[in-house]
Amino acid sequence: LAGKSSEGSLEAAERALLARLPPPWRSGRLAPLASGLTNCNYRLRLPSGRSHFLRQGHPDPVRLGIDRATEWQLYQGAVGQGLALPCHHSDPASGLMLLDWCDEPNWLAAPPPAALQPGLLAGVLTRLHRLPVPSVVMAVRAHSAGYRARLARVPTWLPALERGLLASREPADCWLPCHHDLNPANLLGSRPWVIDWEYGAAGHPGFEVASIQRTHNWQDAQREALEQSYCERAGGPVGPRGFQSRAFLPWVDYIGLLWALLMAEQQPGPDYQALIDLNRQRLE
């Protein structure tokens, strides 16, 4: 009985989701996809045989430092640059987006050859940096402070771990449009298409590159290859002092740690604990 009740509530939720779409898409059927750590994702199949990608964003974006209006602004610009899949319907207030379907696997499932990845991501960044700079800024110190303030319980080991980083000074000399989550799961195919723009905002490009290095498990040489390829494509360095990405590596670890602690409070599980352990180890 419990299983049937659970299935029934799931079907009701999916029907409610379909009802929020414009009429042409309400007749489709939803098939759940492997969701990200914060989103619910579906394949929407229409009677015509066409498919679309339906994304329902996290219900509490403020807790995670997500600005839906900025996400939508950047997404529209990214479509124009050929970075993001065309969008057929969007409700920025709720994080609902209906996109073209893409059959290409993400880089977790089928990564391009390692030697090509820095150049491909340099291409993503050069096109991304052509967009207008958003008014909403994701500065690492303020962003991490927001996460920390929302923790219901601060681990006893955290103050000593963060003390040195918080006493340092991070670069703050360049602000450009940033995705802030260019991890392998958010890159589709060899183009690549970029998905999940939730953390998009103005940011320091060095933090973007440091985040790429961490989430792709790159060595310094691959990060440096990305930066060199970017300079060649853009016709010069980024900002007055270059990427300065090494200075942002501990900030990537710190923000990743706080994010995982926040998510674990809401939904404890092994995935979040693994992220907590990894980022804590990197900061020690």
Over which residues does each language-model region extend?
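ATP-binding pocket architecture of kinase catalytic cores
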Residues: 31-137
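N-terminal non-globular leader segments, chiefly Sec-dependent signal peptides
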Residues: 2-40
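Active-site acidic catalytic loop and adjacent metal/ATP-binding pocket
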Residues: 34-46, 50-54, 165-207
